[in-house]
Regions:
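A short beta-strand-loop micro-motif that forms or neighbors metal/cofactor-
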Residues: 74, 155, 161-163, 167, ...
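Electropositive, surface-exposed helix/loop patches at the edges of structured domains
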Residues: 26-38, 97, 181-185, 211-227
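C-terminal helical cap(s) of enzyme catalytic domains, especially alpha/beta-barrels
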Residues: 184-218
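Catalytic alpha/beta core domains of metabolic enzymes, predominantly
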Residues: 62-181
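Active-site beta->alpha loop and helix N-cap motifs at the rims of alpha/beta catalytic domains
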Residues: 1-69
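Glycine-rich, proline-tolerant flexible connector loops at the mouths of alpha/beta enzymes
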Residues: 1-11, 181-195
Length: 227
């Protein structure tokens, strides 16, 4: 029953604003094969002011006809999220439908697993699988801390839970972070409770930098001990 978006009619506005504010890339979720053509047409009509990454949501990871349709276009890269209620192997196998159709520009996104074992978070945080995905595939790995945590809660240390799990994923080697920000989360039409305020962006980026430095130091140490 959540907000479903404005559909294709909003695409010209989105691309106009992306160009105006010099946004480099937009992740756009597609749920039907016709939406791919809608996006490509609107992007071309707007003069290609921004990059677009098509997104396959968790509930469509095993929508094989959609995967094949998205895979047949090779202009836009694809972000595919871990599937809803299926194994990691099954989710990774879904990426083969994209690659087999011709699109090998794929990013795999860990976004938490739906189980009450993750309570009080929205989903069970699965960022320990970052190195596992890299071991099993050649794919860059994205983490989605917003959908994993699902709230703006913070610990006794004053650090937001979203930032804690983001650091976990970055230290584990994540290549990309997908996180929700909103100027007024309380008025957001979707996912407001998990969105961070825009004035927290600098804090978030600084915290990410600390986590990245920790990752780099750990990999340097590993090279030292592994010869």
């Amino acid at each position: 029953y959540s907000f479903q978006g404005h559909g294709a009619e909003c695409l010209p506005w989105v691309f106009e604003l992306a160009g105006k504010y010099d946004i480099k890339v937009i992740a756009m979720e597609v749920t039907h094969d016709t939406q791919v053509d809608d996006i490509l047409t609107a992007l071309d009509d707007a003069g290609n002011p921004t990059g677009v990454m098509l997104q396959i949501g968790t509930r469509n990871t095993q929508n094989f006809e959609l995967l094949k349709a998205v895979g047949r276009q090779t202009e836009l890269p694809v972000l595919i999220k871990r599937g809803f209620g299926i194994t990691l192997e099954e989710s990774l196998n879904a990426t083969e439908y994209l690659a087999r159709e011709g699109n090998s520009n794929i990013v795999f996104c860990l976004r938490g697993m739906k189980t009450n074992l993750g309570d009080p978070h929205r989903n069970f945080v699965d960022f320990s699988h970052v190195p596992a995905v890299k071991h099993l595939t050649h794919l860059p790995v994205c983490i989605d801390p917003s959908h994993s945590v699902g709230s703006r809660n913070r610990g006794p240390d004053g650090i937001l839970d979203v930032m804690h799990v983001t650091a976990q994923g970055i230290i584990a080697g994540a290549n990309m972070v997908l996180v929700d920000f909103h100027p007024r989360p309380e008025q957001a039409l979707v996912d407001g409770p998990q969105a961070l305020h825009l004035d927290e962006l600098s804090w978030f980026l600084d915290d990410m930098s600390i986590a990245r430095e920790a990752h780099d130091k750990r990999t340097q140490l590993a090279r030292q001990y592994n010869g």
